[in-house]
């Protein structure tokens, strides 16, 4: 998961906070990226079950908008500002997920992938463009001893956002395959939908 300490997006547009326009709040705005990161790292296993909750405790209070000077947004707020879920994936994989637009923490924590042969810690980031500002760490055993292997950050040789746009345009122009397979998008959206439906029960 991930999130923002005080980051309900209303400084330039209020469409993110209105259910009839956005459908989802933090869950759909930034939660999709957190889920995509983990699903991609795991090889995009099929989601089996989702149990989740989504709340609006902060977005409905005028205090949540004090930094942007828009207390009237509290009356318009009709989406989630926090969501959490327990997601079972194919292969016996369990995903514990949290995302927030507003919280009294700097982060709900790093992304941690735990396995039987080792674990991977992906540092939390405020950036949602697929880049990291801290190295990842692999926790594993070597010769029966627990060790930590830091995965160094490699400097980007090109602009990652530009590469994403160009790969999409190339697929459109040449009629080639989409850079992201449809199944990955469907799995991501199924998880988001499952969290919201579970919360509505």
Indicate where each model-derived feature is located.
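C-terminal helix-rich "cap/oligomerization" subdomain common to oxidoreductases
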Residues: 90, 143-146, 153, 166-201
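A structural signal for well-ordered alpha-helical segments within the folded catalytic domains
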Residues: 28, 32-36, 159-166, 183-190
